[in-house]
Amino acid sequence: MAESENEPKVLANIPFLFYDVIGRTFPGGFLLLGSVLSLWHVLPIGDAFVRFLAVARVSELSTGAATVVIGTSLLIFAIISTFLGFFVLSPLSNLLVEKLWGLCAPLRLEGMSKFLGTENLQFLQTQFKIQFGFEPSDESLNRSSFLCAYFIWKVNPGLGVMQGRYDADLLAAQSTVLASLVLFVGTLIERFRLGPDPFLTLWLVALGATLVGSFLAFEYQRKKRVYGRFGMFLALSNSPHEEPAHGKT
């Protein structure tokens, strides 16, 4: 019986690991790999790789040894990517992308009404006031959504996991916006320094497209996270539910 009780807890941890990969490792890997491509003319990475292949061919490096070298390189790449995503991109993108853009284009009740497809939010505001003692306003909409998140986790952990995906998608989008912007500016400077270069020109176009696409994704994901929390709260508060049972066998 104890084993069956612990099984859902173990399985519930798997999505969060996947969300960490989405929100932190992928943007960090993009920044790391993009930096290598942007500085390809400066860093002797291409020559080092060619020399490695030559040494491996001359010394008849075994398949097992080559696999170890490649696996270790990928592990180091993943560690550095996670470090960049967790300690560099995540806090900076929260400050420079989410908060600054939130000042320029704040989320409002009118926008939530359109997003949820309802013309009247009075019932939602009433239900929110019943649960938390006050009504959400335009100024407090983002902060108030966290109370909806806590309520959803309490009532339905399954929907709470879905919220985790929303958070991961938003973090990935805003981190990619920052990484794309840094890479675009750095590559543009390198392009002016070296002069016309077909590779850097093509890479600039790709970075520009990535920057625009990631920003559009960020704009949608931030709405989905905040407005989606209120939508889930409305759905749960408008239907009977049972408190999650604890300690049952």
Residue ranges and their predicted role:
Residues M1-E119, E190-V205, L216-K223:
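N-terminal first transmembrane alpha-helix
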Residues A2-P8, W153-P157, P240-T249:
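Solvent-exposed, extramembrane regions of membrane proteins
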Residues N13-F26, E135-L188:
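Loop-to-transmembrane boundary segments
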Residues L31, A172, L181, R229-M232:
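Enrichment for repetitive, rod-forming helical segments
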Residues G34, L181-G186, V205-G213:
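Hydrophobic core of alpha-helical transmembrane segments in multi-pass integral membrane proteins
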Residues S93-G160:
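Charge-rich cytosolic interhelical loops and cytosolic tails of multi-pass membrane proteins
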Residues E98, T126, G164, A168, ...:
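Charged/polar, solvent-exposed surface patches and flexible loops
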Residues W203-T249:
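Alpha-helical oligomerization segments
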